[in-house]
């Protein structure tokens, strides 16, 4: 290879990333218009297209590099020089951290995920940690209650870039002040002030105002979800001021926010204070930089591994028929491998399973489906693998594993947030905790269905409980769109003997689902059955599911709330306006999405 080509290749990769992130910002900048026009289907399409942008631009750069090198092979020294030149381009580059991830992606695409070493890749960043600790330009604006909280909030809401009229701005301000007074106390409120992010955070059918509430006792989140009525008027739906509430809003089971972030590292640094429990990976994930979040997630894994002497073990819970799941005892994530052969009742291919996981990545997860990161050629030290797990890997997924002596390479796996399996949780709790879990499970099913997702296998073992007590679906191999399912009532038995027969007396076609059958496996536990019948009996009726299908086919997009229904201003304080459709969830049982 001629000298000087290394710099050209480095510049080509960085220019390719520039093009990708430019398109990323372009799609993101359309969020306000989509919100104001209530173009909810365009919101969903923009979410999918933005996810695809990264891989598309990696592919474009790879083709450019193949043209530049004329298809000639490159040696190790040449690749090291390319990385050196690329590293020299980054100190003054505003998105250096994601540019490093983009370089990694291009390398992996070129070399089919082989020879993934720190010398060739940015396994760890080449730049100082948290380089934007001092933000180069303001990301937020401060507001002080010099003349009271009412004019302060009026300034905040009036400064928003939204062009729609307000339904009743003064009323919403009263509600916010009422909430702050209840939360902080009337005496403390005059000594507090707010810092508000310059950009709104868009997701689903809401525009979120994200801020920091500085109190005498510390800094709290200040989150206002802004919705629009069917008539095109704005209103504030609630005010959230606890770190637990903010953590759920920015949770791993939710779609990525659309927030205009030309300096993503600076925004992540700004968010840390109100989301202290979130890792760097989770913060990048929340603002839509999911590929760099994968890089950060891997770095967090390596750091944990370096400080731990734990061994990988099979994850607790009922062993899956499709996936082999393992973890480290103290680590908050699990590793999932598609088995080489599935149980006989699982009539599907590995390609189908991967397509299901991709569907979840691109779909609105409504707070009820865990996000995943996909890895290829994942290396594990055999000394850190429990012998029982090693035997299981060789038994269930030998075609996915390459033995390199001291290490094994797993050809493909997913990393996902670790949760307590719901079936285990239900065995351990009683009273109100049991009731809350059953309510959460039913709500998860409802909200997934309203988002056009049918879980397929609804057994408790396929759901997990998060640290906030939320129930989240995580087994995707039978997932499908609601519109693909034929929900049927079980026909009346012809003879008394029919109900005792081992085979059904009625025909069953592919895609047929009989909701009455859910009762058999969801209500078998005498502690659970009465609670289910009380709160979620309609899930056993085919007409409930068919009604949801009709709404979906008519183009209706349900509201998704990242908080409990009782926290909404319309429920807490509503006295001076008639209820409207914007405040009515599809079921009275829906609490939080």
UniProtKB/Swiss-Prot annotation:
The keyword Hydrolase is annotated on this UniProt entry: yes
Origin superkingdom: Bacteria
CC terms in the record's Gene Ontology section: cytoplasm
Catalytic reactions on record: L-seryl-[isocitrate dehydrogenase] + ATP = O-phospho-L-seryl-[isocitrate dehydrogenase] + ADP + H(+)
GO biological process, one term: tricarboxylic acid cycle
Keywords recorded for this protein, A-Z: ATP-binding, Cytoplasm, Glyoxylate bypass, Hydrolase, Kinase, Nucleotide-binding, Protein phosphatase, Serine/threonine-protein kinase, Transferase, Tricarboxylic acid cycle
Name of the molecule in the record: Isocitrate dehydrogenase kinase/phosphatase
Gene name for this UniProt entry: aceK
């Amino acid at each position: 290879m001629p000298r000087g080509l290394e710099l050209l290749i480095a510049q080509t990769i960085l220019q390719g990333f520039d093009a990708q992130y430019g398109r990323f910002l372009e799609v993101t900048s359309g969020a306000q218009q989509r919100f104001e026009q209530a173009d909810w289907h365009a919101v969903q399409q923009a979410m999918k297209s933005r996810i695809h942008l990264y891989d598309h631009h990696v592919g474009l750069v790879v083709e450019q590099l193949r043209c530049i090198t004329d298809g000639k092979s490159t040696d190790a020294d040449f690749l090291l020089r390319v990385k050196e030149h690329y590293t020299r381009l980054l100190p003054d580059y505003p998105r250096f951290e994601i540019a490093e991830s983009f370089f990694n992606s291009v390398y992996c695409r070129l070399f089919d995920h082989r020879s993934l070493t720190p010398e060739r890749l940015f396994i760890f960043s080449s730049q100082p940690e948290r380089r934007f600790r001092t933000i180069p330009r303001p990301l937020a604006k401060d507001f002080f209650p010099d003349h009271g909280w009412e004019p302060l909030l009026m300034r905040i809401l009036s400064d928003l870039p939204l062009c729609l009229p307000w339904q009743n701005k003064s009323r919403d301000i009263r509600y916010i002040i009422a909430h702050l007074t209840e939360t902080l106390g009337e005496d403390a409120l005059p000594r507090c002030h707010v810092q508000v992010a310059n950009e709104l955070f868009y997701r689903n059918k809401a525009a979120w105002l994200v801020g920091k509430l500085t109190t005498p006792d510390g800094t709290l989140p200040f989150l206002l979800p802004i919705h629009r009525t069917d008539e095109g008027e704005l209103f504030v739906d609630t005010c959230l001021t606890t770190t637990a509430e903010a953590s759920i809003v920015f949770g791993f089971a939710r779609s990525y926010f659309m927030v205009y972030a030309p300096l993503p590292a600076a925004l992540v640094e700004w968010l840390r204070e109100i989301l202290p429990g979130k890792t760097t990976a989770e913060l990048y994930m929340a603002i839509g930089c999911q590929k760099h979040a994968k890089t950060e997630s891997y770095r967090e894994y390596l750091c944990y591994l370096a400080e731990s002497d734990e061994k990988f073990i099979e994850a607790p819970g009922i062993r899956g028929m499709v996936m082999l799941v393992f973890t480290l005892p103290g680590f908050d994530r699990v590793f999932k491998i598609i088995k080489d052969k599935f149980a006989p009742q699982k009539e599907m291919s590995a390609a189908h399973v991967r397509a299901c996981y991709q569907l979840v990545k691109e779909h609105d997860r409504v707070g009820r489906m865990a996000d995943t990161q996909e890895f290829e050629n994942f290396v594990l030290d055999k000394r850190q693998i429990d012998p029982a797990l090693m035997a299981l890997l060789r038994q269930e997924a030998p075609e996915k594993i390459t033995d390199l002596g001291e290490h094994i390479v797993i050809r493909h796996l997913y990393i996902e947030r670790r949760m307590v399996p719901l079936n285990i949780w239900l065995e351990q709790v009683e009273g109100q905790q049991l009731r809350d879990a059953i309510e959460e499970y039913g709500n998860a099913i409802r909200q997934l269905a309203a988002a056009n997702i049918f879980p397929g296998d609804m057994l408790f073992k396929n759901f997990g409980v998060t640290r906030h007590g939320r129930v989240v679906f995580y087994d995707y191999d039978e997932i499908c769109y609601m519109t693909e399912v034929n929900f049927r009532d079980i026909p009346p038995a012809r003879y008394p003997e029919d109900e005792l027969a081992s085979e059904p007396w009625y025909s069953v076609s592919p895609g047929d689902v009989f909701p009455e059958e859910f009762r058999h496996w969801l209500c078998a536990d005498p502690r659970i059955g009465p609670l289910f019948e009380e709160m979620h009996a309609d899930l056993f009726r085919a007409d409930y599911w068919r009604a949801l299908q009709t709404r979906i086919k008519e183009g209706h997009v349900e509201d998704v709330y990242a908080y409990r229904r009782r926290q909404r201003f319309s429920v807490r304080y509503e006295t001076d306006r008639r209820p409207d459709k914007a405040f009515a969830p599809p079921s009275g049982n829906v609490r939080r999405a």
